[in-house]
């Protein structure tokens, strides 16, 4: 197969704009799968991807298409995730392509995440083909959306393809546009082999399977290959294509995208973004930089039953095999026992990992409040990264604390502008820009602390705009802030899993609200339970969960008051003794309450 007949392309879109459905139609149209094997969202292989209707891991498929010019082309589709947390996955997928289909919902128009992905594609110099999807909807306005694409993104949308992935309209036009407009890959077959790892996943029988784009040379089964980033050598057992079913072949040549199976046991040895070459004839340099995924949000995961600790450890190991952006380390908590401090790309990533642990591995988990990475300058001049409120040094040992700030792009219908601006201001945001994309839609830019976004900002934004707002954000820098650690004491003992780092201005309010919430959630015991919120040793709020008590004077009937008093005093002394030895069970909901306090 000559390079001229290969096209590598990806699909970029906002969540729910019909990307995976379009991929299904392309697979169906080119006959890559029989009718019997077709199911909705073929490329979304995880149950949770299908249920939530989102793509998490980048997947890939090789299609053979006979074009109108009579030639047969090989089209390599690399599917990309569309959610803000998975931008790193998108950038890897785009690096392996020469072109991209930009899918925009003809009813909803350009969304924040569409913009972010388009800019990524333009950075990689890709040929972008705009496609207006869902044109069969009664609310579709293709002309308005065309203007939006031209005004907001600056792409020429006069030749944008009108399509409907659901009813199969415009699929052939899309395939023809890919053949005509996407440039063929460049590559030298005689040069030393050089390939980029686009994705890696774990197969129970084959070990780690890596999806790679070959730039130069040939990778043959039976050769020894080297992963240059980690410096590991492996015998190459098999190579193959995904059609989307794995099909083995003898070799992968320059320009092609395929799977590499080398019996690798650990995913960390086949890092995404690494360069593969052969040991016999290595290439001179690695492909330009891919950074390892950086965790932005940290949370503690603990098993409800401490006997499940080993199961949780195994489950995290298995998930980390398939998810290079998840990292974790062992953590112990006096309140919750043994568990793990896990790092995630963002809030959605965290929810998905948690859901997969509970669903696929049948674990009951307690999750602590998520925190971002704070930076502290200590009095001895050292800079320290704080991933958990428990790591924060005391006030006497720190000079200042810095927290990460993000630039948030929010697209919102004009009628909801007021509440959205109020929400951003409440979350310590400062407005940077505001522009009308159309008569009814506004794009606003806010700089705000990331810690204010990780809690429940996205949920609040969606609910106050009836689901019409879209959000995209990226990290700006670290800035000094007046932050304090808020502790919750139960009967005088701090519960580390309930500690949070908050801004001083709202710390009093948060403390009061959290104490009230705890009072509601902690079950009544046989003795009084004091719930206190404290900052740096100073108690700022207190609530008492009243004791359950038996009516000890019920059997007295008439008689002297001193008799009743004696019984009550005796009960009081008993409760006091009980309080000294009694342990308070804190229910799972109490740990989640930290997230819900507004």
UniProtKB/Swiss-Prot annotation:
Pfam families: EFG_C, GTP_EFTU, GTP_EFTU_D2, LepA_C. It catalyses: GTP + H2O = GDP + phosphate + H(+). Coiled coil: none annotated. It comes from Magnetococcus marinus (strain ATCC BAA-1437 / JCM 17883 / MC-1). CDD domains: EF4_II, EF4_III, LepA, lepA_C. This is Elongation factor 4. PROSITE patterns: G_TR_1, G_TR_2. Required for accurate and efficient protein synthesis under certain stress conditions. May act as a fidelity factor of the translation reaction, by catalyzing a one-codon backward translocation of tRNAs on improperly translocated ribosomes. Back-translocation proceeds from a post-translocation (POST) complex to a pre-translocation (PRE) complex, thus giving elongation factor G a second chance to translocate the tRNAs correctly. Binds to ribosomes in a GTP-dependent manner. One of its GO terms (biological process) is positive regulation of translation. Belongs to the TRAFAC class translation factor GTPase superfamily. Classic translation factor GTPase family. LepA subfamily. InterPro entries: EF-4 (IPR006297), EFG_III/V (IPR035647), EFG_V-like (IPR000640), EFTu-like_2 (IPR004161), G_TR_CS (IPR031157), LepA_C_sf (IPR038363), LepA_CTD (IPR013842), LepA_IV (IPR035654). It is an enzyme of class 3 (hydrolase). GTP binds at residues 16-21, 133-136. It is found in: Cell inner membrane. It comes from the Bacteria. GO terms for molecular function: GTP binding; GTPase activity; guanosine tetraphosphate binding; ribosome binding; translation elongation factor activity. Its EC number is 3.6.5.n1. Keywords: Cell inner membrane, Cell membrane, GTP-binding, Hydrolase, Membrane, Nucleotide-binding, Protein biosynthesis. HAMAP family: LepA. Gene3D superfamilies: 3.30.70.240, Elongation factor 4, C-terminal domain, Elongation Factor G (Translational Gtpase), domain 3, P-loop containing nucleotide triphosphate hydrolases, Translation factors. Residues 4-186 form the tr-type G domain. The gene is lepA. It is a peripheral membrane protein.
